[in-house]
Regions:
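Charged, alpha-helix-forming regions
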Residues: 1-203
Length: 203
């Protein structure tokens, strides 16, 4: 179990940073350097099928040749309509808005467990990158909360979002990242024997 927590800590931070920080941010430089290694998949601790491994390696390699800053802007900031918004309540709230009911439930979780959350001013905490990094924090400091957080707050919507992102064409790095994250989350789900409630997606 301790090894599972260590993997959640490692991959929660690594993948969360890729979704949360702009590619030009110095805090993600080391992560991008990791993916630039020709043999990074050999260091990946969660086993993948050979065809899947080859596909993801090729996607990410090709994607790293593109302008990631522009792609990040188009996918996660705008100004055009976002094809796969990175906030949970956009999918879980009937109004398809940020700051929806699922975010309030997440905030209640944070408040009940006295988890101080530092994000950008007025930013919803249910951003995929923030929530992956929060999973890492919990694995490191309060692992007894992981089951509730993952099953009730992250895994309810993240696979749906990641599937949508993986299908957005011509953004190879983020397509590969989404597919890799799907595999990682499924691994966490099975290793922790999580039961995730079925929800209705409004988008």
């Amino acid at each position: 179990m301790q090894n599972t927590f260590q993997q959640i800590s490692l991959y929660g931070r690594l993948l969360g940073a890729c979704f949360y920080y702009e590619p030009s941010d110095s805090r993600i430089a080391g992560v991008l350097d990791f993916f630039r290694q020709p043999n990074w998949m050999q260091e990946w601790e969660i086993p993948l099928e050979e065809k899947t491994s080859e596909k993801l390696t090729a996607l990410i390699k090709q994607g790293l040749k593109q302008d990631l800053t522009e792609e990040y802007q188009n996918l996660f900031i705008g100004p055009n309509e976002l094809k796969a918004p990175p906030w949970g309540s956009v999918y879980l709230d009937p109004e398809c808005v940020i700051f929806g009911h699922s975010l309030l439930a997440l905030r209640d979780f944070l408040k009940r467990h006295q988890i101080a959350f530092q994000s950008q001013q007025d930013e919803p905490e249910d951003h995929i990158g923030l929530m992956l990094m929060l999973a890492a924090y919990l694995a490191e400091n309060r692992p007894h909360l992981l089951v509730e957080f993952l099953s009730q707050h992250l895994l309810t919507w993240a696979p749906h979002f990641l599937t949508k992102l993986a299908n957005v064409e011509n953004y190879q790095f983020y397509q590969g990242l989404a597919q890799l994250t799907l595999i990682v989350l499924d691994d966490w789900k099975h290793k922790l024997n999580l039961s995730v409630p079925k929800v209705h997606f409004y988008r």
